[in-house]
Amino acid sequence: MLAIGVVLGAGWALLRAHRRVVGQDRAWRVQEEAKARELSMAEVDELSWQEFELYIADLCRRDGCTEVVVSGKSGDLGADAIGYLADGRKLVIQCKKYAPHRSVSSQDMQKFVGTARLEHGADVALFVTTSRAFTKAALGLALRQDIVALHRDLLGSWVRGAHLETLIPLNGSGGGAKRRPFA
């Protein structure tokens, strides 16, 4: 009887150890997959606009968004991707893959403002770009209309692992001090 108890106890301990190791392995694999999806901003710049939209959707999924769908076409009425944040709020995303030196214009922002909530029912409207800045008029409009404006610097933070929900309150800030152009 004692021998059976010892064998069962050892078996139970081995089973628990096995489950713990399998769980640790699973967590490690998830982390490695996330690292493999992280790109440098130079690599992001090399993406086509379609690949950029898919990559933004992947970042959303990484951060717990669900039901993320990419339209993948023009004529999407300003919604390049739609999904739901972890807390259930509907997220509508406009992606603009512009050259880093370009600014997002007020006209681009106006189009998104006009459709994000009225057409798509966004609870959170996110405008993400590879350019360094939004024009003053575009950023002002975004702030007045509660559009999250994610420029290149904030996108870089997101790419490097910052969680989307930590970036939302920054809304266009974090661009650094304005510098005079080199003479």
Predicted ranges, named:
Residues 1-77, 82-183:
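Mixed-charge (Asp/Glu-Lys/Arg
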